[in-house]
UniProtKB/Swiss-Prot annotation:
Pathway(s) served: Pyrimidine metabolism; UMP biosynthesis via de novo pathway; orotate from (S)-dihydroorotate (quinone route): step 1/1
Family statement: Belongs to the dihydroorotate dehydrogenase family. Type 2 subfamily.
Entry's localization field: Cell membrane
Protein name: Dihydroorotate dehydrogenase (quinone)
Primary location recorded for the protein, binned into one broad class: membrane
Gene Ontology biological process: 'de novo' pyrimidine nucleobase biosynthetic process; 'de novo' UMP biosynthetic process
Residues bound to substrate: K66, N111, R112, M113, G114, F115, N172, N177, N246, T247
């Protein structure tokens, strides 16, 4: 009830303003009695993924809490894990506003944020300050002004700084809002990046006495051949996981809606089938050797079950959380237990 009232107010605002107010409010209330407005007990449904045990298979996708300011609040909502970021080595403002648009009839969102964040050092401070023991994945990216050919260095800088504070690290090369970024999903650029990440992981595991899994986040706008090539590279470089998928550039499912023509990545319900198809193809290619975290268009427990049936070990929500609220976490956890 509280969420529906809050949503009604927020949906009258500019989407980015509403987002900033929400994150600020959650930051202030995450560790005090005011979290009673959203705190909930979620059905226990432990799952093992990437060698880690999560209390339930429902995570918060990257992009909502970019700077890790409200981790404890999302823990109170019962998420099995939170993925913060995308974070870059240096702070950056992102793309010009407006850059966030609701497609309410389709339960979709278009964004062209452009990795706006306060930088990796700020994120590390927030990770150190969190009170809860929730699993936290850190999604890392490159700065916009770093040439793609040198992008690998940005990932390694972020990885070194967040390693000891992260439950796992997600390597984001699939945002459509950073020029040239998606080119890192192919060929020599991909293999060079993954092998460098893996070597850095080995180095940092020895340094900190802690093995932190690494996962690759991929786009939905890939051919079968490209998915197969990515799967081969993941296996040959012994990556621990893959997150499928990021937002899509396709507008096939929202052609006549207001804001559909806006540039950026489309998420939410219109992405559901496309991301599920990618997961199915990945699962065939990976043959159970690398776990898949399914994300994209999960707006109900049934949507989540489709991701599990396609081959996902865990799922993440973002747009569905915006439209449905915290109750979606428990609904998915219960459906997972009952399946």
């Amino acid at each position: 009830m509280f969420y529906k009232l809050a949503q009604k107010v927020m949906f009258q605002m500019d989407p980015e303003l509403a987002h900033n107010i929400a994150i600020g409010s959650l930051k202030m209330t995450g560790n005090n009695l005011l979290n009673c407005f959203y705190r909930q007990q979620v059905k226990s449904s432990p799952v093992t993924c990437m060698g880690l045990t999560f209390p339930n298979p429902v995570g918060l996708a990257a992009g909502l809490d970019k700077d890790g300011e409200s981790i404890d609040a999302f823990h109170a909502m019962g998420f099995g894990h939170v993925e913060v970021g995308t974070v870059t080595p240096r702070p950056q403002a992102g793309n010009d506003q407006p850059r966030l648009f609701r497609l309410k009839p389709a339960k979709g969102i278009i964004n062209r944020m452009g990795f706006n964040n306060k930088g990796v050092d700020n994120l590390v401070r927030n990770l150190m300050a969190k009170k809860s023991d929730i699993m936290v994945g850190v999604n890392i990216g490159k700065n916009k002004d770093t040439p793609v050919e040198q992008g690998k260095d940005d990932y390694l800088i972020c990885m070194e700084k967040v390693y000891q504070y992260a439950s796992y690290i997600a390597v984001n090369i699939s945002s459509p809002n950073t020029p040239g970024l998606r080119s890192m999903q192919y060929g020599e650029l991909l293999d060079d990046l993954l092998s460098s990440i893996k070597a850095k992981q080995t180095e940092l595991a020895a340094k900190h006495g802690k093995y932190v899994p690494v996962a690759l986040k991929i786009a939905p706008d890939l051919t079968s051949e490209e998915i197969s090539a990515i799967a081969d590279s993941l296996m040959s470089n012994q990556f621990d996981g893959v997150i499928a998928t990021n937002t899509t550039l396709s507008r096939d499912t929202v052609t006549d809606l207001k804001h559909a023509e806006e540039m950026g990545g489309l998420s939410g319900k219109p992405l559901a089938d496309l991301s599920t198809q990618v997961i199915k193809q990945l699962a065939i290619c990976l043959q159970g050797k690398i776990p898949i975290i399914g994300v994209g268009g999960i707006n109900s427990a049934a949507d989540a079950l489709a991701k599990f049936d396609a081959g996902s070990t865990m799922v993440q929500i973002y747009s569905g959380f915006i439209y449905q609220g915290p109750k979606l976490v428990d609904q998915i956890a219960r459906a997972y237990c009952a399946k």
